[in-house]
């Protein structure tokens, strides 16, 4: 089919765009703790996990491994650009060995032998993702230097315990391959559904979970 080469070129152009494209995954609540965290295979490789915060699934956990001390960890926390989420400000934390011990209470237990670095929402930058045709607000964007090698976690949650939607991105090096061409339409449809692209506005800000 003639459309296939054109599609391949369009996808390649999207991946190579300055805005970049993260390889997506979608959470249905299965990544809610350290024992069932989403596995980040390589912290340099660009991935994103989309997650809906509910009263039953209040956290998103990702597990990573730092190959050496001093390794940089690039992370982003975003919120879909949906009217009811305009003031939604979740929080991100990196939990890993060598980080400072916790100085406050968290809605989850810090694994033994690990410290924590909290990355609170301090910005609200509009972001258009051409790969999926979606729009978001980026509320956290940091490169954190990991003081020790070994396993660690990235945790996202809403400090006010309100339902909402968020995504967490890790890494900056795109690693799309030929096989990903076959997944593109499914990824795009799922991302647009998550961002409620084309959907009618629904309600106002949600109340905190009891």
Predicted regions, residues:
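A mature extracytoplasmic/lumenal domain signature
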Residues: 68, 77-81, 158-160, 172
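Non-catalytic, beta-strand-enriched accessory regions in extracellular/secretory proteins
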Residues: 40-66, 72, 78-81, 91-92, ...
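Positively charged n-region of N-terminal signal peptides that target proteins for export
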Residues: 1-5
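C-terminal edge strands of extracellular/lumenal beta-sandwich accessory domains
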Residues: 22-34, 62, 90-100, 134-210
């Amino acid at each position: 089919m003639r459309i296939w080469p054109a599609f391949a070129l369009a996808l390649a152009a999207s991946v190579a765009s300055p805005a970049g494209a993260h390889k997506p995954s979608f959470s249905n609540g299965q990544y809610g703790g350290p024992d069932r965290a989403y596995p980040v295979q390589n912290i340099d490789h660009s991935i994103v996990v989309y997650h809906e915060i509910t009263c039953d699934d209040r956290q998103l956990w990702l597990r990573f491994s730092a190959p050496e001390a001093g390794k940089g960890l690039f992370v982003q926390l975003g919120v879909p650009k949906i009217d009811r989420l305009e003031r939604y400000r979740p929080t991100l934390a990196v939990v890993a060995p060598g980080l400072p011990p916790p100085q406050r209470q968290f809605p989850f237990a810090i694994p033994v032998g690990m410290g924590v670095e909290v990355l609170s929402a301090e910005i609200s930058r509009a972001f258009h993702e051409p790969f999926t045709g979606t729009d978001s607000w980026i509320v956290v964007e940091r490169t954190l230097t990991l003081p020790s090698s070994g396993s660690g976690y990235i945790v996202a949650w809403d400090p006010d315990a309100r339902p909402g939607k968020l995504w967490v991105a890790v890494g900056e090096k795109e690693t799309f391959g030929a096989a990903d061409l076959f997944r593109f339409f499914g990824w795009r449809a799922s991302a647009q559904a998550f961002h409620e692209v084309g959907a009618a506005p629904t309600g106002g800000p949600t109340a905190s979970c009891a």
